[in-house]
Amino acid sequence: AHDITASAPVLAAIDISKARHEVLIEAPDKKRRRRVSVLNNLEEFDRLIGLLRSYQRPVRVAFEATGNYHRALAYQLGLAGFEIKLISSLALARTREALHNSWDKNDPKDAQVILHMMNIGAEQFYNDPLVHGTNDIQELSKTHDMVSRSKTELWHRILTHYLPLYF
């Protein structure tokens, strides 16, 4: 048997959705994985943080960024001092397909697939826009993008509709 050091982290794979998040927890010193459902509110986030802290080990959390639903939870987990990782949506879909032969986006196995990807190190860094002070830049960038698209749309409308009417 191999020695499990006290620094080996607890892994928490989170399948993010609008109302509730499914969490699969794997501790280095435990055989069985633990499943937890967390509603999308602060009280429930605190309950999860308490549970993860109770293992008395470093914690590494990973999830697929889903809309904006992951942001509040990621922020709280970051404040709690946990290491946060991102799982690429494309990599998750390909891995899910390879492991379970399933394309189903709402597969309950998603947390398992995320955990597998954590174990093989197929993760990306997660930079929380609020923590890193890039939130305003991100919002401005989104606004700029929307304005640019509207401008282009209007220009195309003028070119395709109004120009031919008069020339």
Sequence positions of predicted segments:
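Phosphate- and other anionic-substrate recognition elements at nucleic-acid/protein interfaces
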Residues: A1-F167
